[in-house]
């Protein structure tokens, strides 16, 4: 995205603060005009005191300097007051809008599909959020507090100086041209280079986050030195890329400062020559020297502004790219909140593909009545998880219809749909908050008694009560203060607390020991009564009592029936059962006490 368009997008992100932005822009224009009153009045006072008449448009008879001094004081007070008001409101605008856009970004990212998050490192998204909002804050603050006034000063100065003395004004105009050409060349030279620098910053953030997120692996495999060396390599590469960019902008700074001396000398030289010919006055020479000094100052601010926009551009581009990412699913304009559903689920010729080439789900049709338990089995990548993801609209199918209680799920609000579905993931997902906070994800207004009941039914109450802080115990980052079994039992309790009509169990008992698994299965059997339950299973022992089992292979259901019916068919499901030693050749109904070690799970 070109830099001007990118900055226009930055101003567009002002949102509700845009009106205040226009007010500040008008105030900056008045401030710019008032600032140039000082050198004009100063020059007039010099002419009055020296007895010389100004020339050209400023030619007037000599007069008392006191009215000029009074006008100078009035303009000075106005400049101070207006500048303070602009700075105060610019600060407030920038701070308020930074928090607003940060919240909008966070909400937007949470709505992006799981496929987006799978392909994007969470550390990178955090870095983009924090760096992007900080960059916006700096640009908004600088633009409305200083840089816009500097731009307006240039707009005011050039016509004003031409009006006073066009010959001396040509020197100021030449200075502006030199600055514009120089800055444009440097920006073009270094724009792509700065983009590579920012990409390295993202790599640095992602690598550090990756190492910290796997600290147990790093320490147990003695990888500390290797990870530090890897980070140092990325940092060194970043520094090597950044140095040429800094060198170019340092050159601009040097030339800017050198131009101050050159311009002032040129004005004095040309001014003296014009004065000898009677084409200018001493006051006008002094006035234009002040103009030149102010012009250099304003140009430095403008160059600083361009430099800051340039340096922030890659960060802003990343930020805008995330904001422009489109969620896979959205509420339709006519979407309705269905309230509490009964749990009648229908898949009618549903097909879906992630890449548009290989189908992940193809012509899937089945009906689950309220209270039934539907198990989905098959090899990894067969389409089980995709089918369930379509049910709660992580994606929408390319063809076919999914209905709940006879209503197309695409006609329901996402919040209304997902409020009716409880999920227990294979990997227990917990926040770095208290146990109570994690449980209330399922029901925000849950009482402690309700949490105790849910925890008890999930076999989690015992370990919660053993803790000194009980439900106020912090679970740690991603629940790391708890064991795997404890985390999973809390996630089950959370789903029970939600009390949804539709329940999804993604190998929900895989992290539990045999004794606890048996207890939790008994609790789940009781809880699943009256609910439509979908069980994604790899261990076939967990789905023996399912109402129906759907056997997936390459996105299709190749077998369907009860546990015993599928065994009797001696098909693919029976092969899976044999592989897990769930049945014996002589008696298919006999179940082993435990799965032997070394037998792979499917």
From Swiss-Prot:
Annotated membrane topology: Multi-pass membrane protein
Transmembrane segments: 22-42, 68-88, 146-166, 167-187, 238-258, 285-305
Cellular compartment(s): Cell inner membrane
Keywords: ATP-binding, Cell inner membrane, Cell membrane, Membrane, Nucleotide-binding, Sugar transport, Translocase, Transmembrane, Transmembrane helix, Transport
GO CC aspect terms: plasma membrane
Domain annotation ABC transmembrane type-1: ranges: 21-311
Reactions mediated catalytically: [(1->2)-beta-D-glucosyl](n)(in) + ATP + H2O = [(1->2)-beta-D-glucosyl](n)(out) + ADP + phosphate + H(+)
GO MF entry, a single one: ABC-type beta-glucan transporter activity
Keyword Coiled coil annotated: no
PROSITE patterns, per the entry: ABC_TM1F (PS50929), ABC_TRANSPORTER_1 (PS00211), ABC_TRANSPORTER_2 (PS50893), NDVA (PS51317)
Domain ABC transporter intervals: 345-579
List of residues binding ATP: 378-385
Catalytic EC class: translocase
Enzyme Commission number: 7.5.2.3
InterPro entries: AAA+_ATPase, ABC1_TM_dom, ABC1_TM_sf, ABC_transporter-like_ATP-bd, ABC_transporter-like_CS, P-loop_NTPase, Type_1_exporter
Main location: membrane
Role according to the record: Involved in Beta-(1-->2)glucan export. Transmembrane domains (TMD) form a pore in the inner membrane and the ATP-binding domain (NBD) is responsible for energy generation.
Annotated PANTHER family: ATP-BINDING CASSETTE SUB-FAMILY B MEMBER 10, MITOCHONDRIAL, ATP-DEPENDENT PERMEASE MDL1, MITOCHONDRIAL
Assembly: Homodimer.
Protein family (similarity comment): Belongs to the ABC transporter superfamily. Beta-(1-->2)glucan exporter (TC 3.A.1.108.1) family.
Domain observations: In NdvA the ATP-binding domain (NBD) and the transmembrane domain (TMD) are fused.
Designated name of the protein: Beta-(1-->2)glucan export ATP-binding/permease protein NdvA
Gene this protein is translated from: ndvA
């Amino acid at each position: 995205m070109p830099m001007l368009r990118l900055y226009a997008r930055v101003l567009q992100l002002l949102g509700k603060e845009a009106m205040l932005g226009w007010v500040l822009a008008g105030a900056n224009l008045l401030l710019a005009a008032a600032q140039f009153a000082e050198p004009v009045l100063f020059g007039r006072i010099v002419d009055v005191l020296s007895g010389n008449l100004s020339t050209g448009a400023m030619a007037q008879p000599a007069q008392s300097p006191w009215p000029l001094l009074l006008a100078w004081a009035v303009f000075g007070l106005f400049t101070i007051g207006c500048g303070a008001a602009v700075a105060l409101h610019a600060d407030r605008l920038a701070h308020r809008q930074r928090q607003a856009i940060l919240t909008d970004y966070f909400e937007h990212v949470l709505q992006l599909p799981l496929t987006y998050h799978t392909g994007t490192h969470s550390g990178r998204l955090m870095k983009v959020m924090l760096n992007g909002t900080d960059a916006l804050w700096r640009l908004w603050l600088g633009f409305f507090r200083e840089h816009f006034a500097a731009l307006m000063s240039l707009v005011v100065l050039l016509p004003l100086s031409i009006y006073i003395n066009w010959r001396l004004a040509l020197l100021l105009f030449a200075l502006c041209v030199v600055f514009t050409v120089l800055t444009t060349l440097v920006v073009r030279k270094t724009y792509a280079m700065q983009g590579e620098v920012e990409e390295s910053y993202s790599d640095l953030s992602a690598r550090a986050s990756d190492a910290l997120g796997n600290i147990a692996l790093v320490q147990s495999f003695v990888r500390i030195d290797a990870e530090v060396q890897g980070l140092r390599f990325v940092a060194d590469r970043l520094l090597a890329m950044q140095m040429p960019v800094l060198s170019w902008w340092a050159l601009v700074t040097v030339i800017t400062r050198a131009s101050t001396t050159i311009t002032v000398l040129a004005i004095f030289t040309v001014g003296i020559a014009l004065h000898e010919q009677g084409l200018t006055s001493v006051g006008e020479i002094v006035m234009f020297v002040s103009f030149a000094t102010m012009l250099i100052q304003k140009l430095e601010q403008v160059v600083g502004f361009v430099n800051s926009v340039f340096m922030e551009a890659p960060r802003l581009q990343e930020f805008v790219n995330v904001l422009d990412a489109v969620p896979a699913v959205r509420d339709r304009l006519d979407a309705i909140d269905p309230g509490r559903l009964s749990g009648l689920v229908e898949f009618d010729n549903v097909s879906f593909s992630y890449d548009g080439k290989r189908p992940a789900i193809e012509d899937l049709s089945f009906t689950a009545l309220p209270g039934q338990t539907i198990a989905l089995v098959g090899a990894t990548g067969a389409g089980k998880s995709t089918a369930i993801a379509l049910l709660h609209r992580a994606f929408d199918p390319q063809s076919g219809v999914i209905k709940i209680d006879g209503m197309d799920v695409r006609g329901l609000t996402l919040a209304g749909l997902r409020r009716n579905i409880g999920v227990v993931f294979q990997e227990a997902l917990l926040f770095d908050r208290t146990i109570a906070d994690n449980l209330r994800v399922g029901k925000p207004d849950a009482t402690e008694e309700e949490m105790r009941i849910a925890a008890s039914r999930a076999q989690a109450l015992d370990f919660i009560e053993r803790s000194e802080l009980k439900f106020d115990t912090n679970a740690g980052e991603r629940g790391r203060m708890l064991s795997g079994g404890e985390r999973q039992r809390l996630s089950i309790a959370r789903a029970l607390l939600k009390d949804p009509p539709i329940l999804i169990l993604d190998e929900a008992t895989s992290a539990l020991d045999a004794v606890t698994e048996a207890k939790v299965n008994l609790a789940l059997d009781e809880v699943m009564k009256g609910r439509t339950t979908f069980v994604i299973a790899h261990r076939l022992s967990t789905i023996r009592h399912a109402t129906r089992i759907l056997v997936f292979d390459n996105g299709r259901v190749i077998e369907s029936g009860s546990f015993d019916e599928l065994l009797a068919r001696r098909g693919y499901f029976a092969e899976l059962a044999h592989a897990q030693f769930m049945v014996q050749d002589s008696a298919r109904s006999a179940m082993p006490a435990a799965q032997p070690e070394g037998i792979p799970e499917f």
